[in-house]
């Protein structure tokens, strides 16, 4: 039985969405159990033989400063959910709450793995090859050093290797061009570190990639800082939404376009399902001594269910131990990079 701790109060919609998703998830996973963390009155209407309520009196708001979430709201649903992972009561925690708060609380309670300075958010985005590209970081770390990007590359490679049972997934460094001479000094230095890691056998480093390569599936892992990654993510979601709305408008234009829509319906449905960002919701916070998954704050029930699915798959595939093993193998390289650059910012 795989147990997940769910922050039922987090996100833009709270229990209205999270509880609906939890029911759908339990109905499709007979070997899963959920710890529903939140204010008991808000969760009172939910009953399932494989779900139990863990009370938490406080809620971390989407605009709460990190200091408030970490130091003042010590009985928040987010913190209590992560505490379940620390105490061994749950294999993973899932939250749609405040990203900064989730990262800070997770890092405070669970700590980072040896050789890792900062955890990274690592979602999987659909690509043209019918698979997914893992991109990290997508919002947790806005300002990154070259050494942080090396750590992200090792963690992302370990994640894809664990989920896909693949020995050496390809890794690309997001840049403004493929040439080694392009990019900021941080990116150039990161390229040097990644090439060294590739030569040492710790990575299958492809080289520099551009934004369109994420969706081409040029590499299985793309490494970038959180600012660039988050912009790329939100831009892709905006484009997908724009195309979907434009198609709906065009097919409603007249009787002939409506007839065409009927004929094309199966193809359009398959296409929309393939690019629907809700079905790719749920990103691992890599680099921690426990499994934590971040859902979009605006997630609906379908999207949050997929975040639960990702956490379940990670726990079932023993993701944490497999990532830890890969990072341990690369630890001398990571420590050497850290020592060359001096102490990293927290």
From Swiss-Prot:
GO MF, one example: phosphate:acyl-[acyl carrier protein] acyltransferase activity
Enzyme Commission number(s) of this protein: 2.3.1.274
Protein name: Phosphate acyltransferase
Pathway participation: Lipid metabolism; phospholipid metabolism
Pfam family, one: FA_synthesis
Gene name of this polypeptide: plsX
UniProt enzyme class: transferase
Recorded catalytic activity of this chain's protein: a fatty acyl-[ACP] + phosphate = an acyl phosphate + holo-[ACP]
Gene Ontology annotations of biological process type: fatty acid biosynthetic process; phospholipid biosynthetic process
Matching HAMAP family: PlsX (MF_00019)
Assembly information from the UniProt record: Homodimer. Probably interacts with PlsY.
UniProt family annotation: Belongs to the PlsX family.
Function: Catalyzes the reversible formation of acyl-phosphate (acyl-PO(4)) from acyl-[acyl-carrier-protein] (acyl-ACP). This enzyme utilizes acyl-ACP as fatty acyl donor, but not acyl-CoA.
Residues that span the membrane, as ranges: none
GO CC field: cytoplasm
Keywords: Cytoplasm, Lipid biosynthesis, Lipid metabolism, Phospholipid biosynthesis, Phospholipid metabolism, Transferase
SUPFAM superfamilies on file: Isocitrate/Isopropylmalate dehydrogenase-like
Organism this protein belongs to: Delftia acidovorans (strain DSM 14801 / SPH-1)
Keyword Lipid metabolism: yes
Subcellular location, record wording: Cytoplasm
């Amino acid at each position: 039985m795989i147990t997940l701790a769910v922050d039922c109060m987090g996100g833009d919609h709270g229990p209205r969405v999270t509880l609906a998703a939890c029911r759908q998830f339990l109905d499709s996973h007979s070997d899963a159990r959920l710890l529903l963390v939140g204010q008991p009155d808000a969760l009172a209407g939910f009953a399932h033989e494989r779900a139990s309520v863990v009370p938490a009196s406080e809620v971390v708001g989407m605009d709460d400063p990190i200091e408030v979430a970490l130091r003042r709201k010590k009985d928040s649903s987010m913190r209590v959910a992560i505490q379940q992972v620390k105490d061994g009561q749950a294999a993973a925690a899932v939250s749609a709450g405040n990203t900064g708060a989730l990262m800070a609380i997770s890092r405070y309670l669970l700590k980072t793995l040896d050789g890792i300075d900062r955890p990274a958010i690592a979602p999987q985005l659909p690509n043209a090859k019918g698979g997914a590209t893992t991109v990290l970081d997508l919002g947790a770390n806005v300002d990154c050093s070259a050494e942080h990007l090396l750590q992200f590359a090792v963690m992302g490679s370990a994640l894809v290797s664990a989920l896909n049972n693949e020995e050496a997934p390809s890794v690309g460094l997001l840049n403004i061009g493929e040439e080694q001479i392009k990019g900021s000094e941080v990116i150039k230095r990161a390229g040097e570190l990644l090439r060294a890691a590739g030569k040492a056998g710790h990575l299958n480093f492809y080289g520099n990639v551009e934004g369109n390569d994420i969706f081409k599936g040029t590499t299985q892992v793309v490494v970038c800082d959180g600012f660039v990654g988050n912009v790329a993510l939100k831009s892709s979601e905006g484009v997908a939404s724009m195309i979907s709305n434009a198609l709906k408008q065009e097919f409603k234009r007249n009787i002939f376009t409506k007839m065409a829509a009927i004929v094309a319906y199966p193809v359009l449905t398959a296409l929309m399902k393939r690019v629907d960002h809700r079905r790719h919701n749920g990103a691992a916070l890599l680099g921690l001594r426990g499994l934590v998954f971040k859902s979009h704050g605006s997630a609906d029930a379908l999207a949050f269910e997929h975040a639960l699915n990702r956490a379940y798959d990670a726990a079932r595939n023993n993701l944490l131990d497999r990532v830890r093993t890969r990072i341990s193998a690369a630890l001398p390289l990571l420590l050497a990079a850290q020592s060359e650059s001096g102490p990293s910012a927290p």
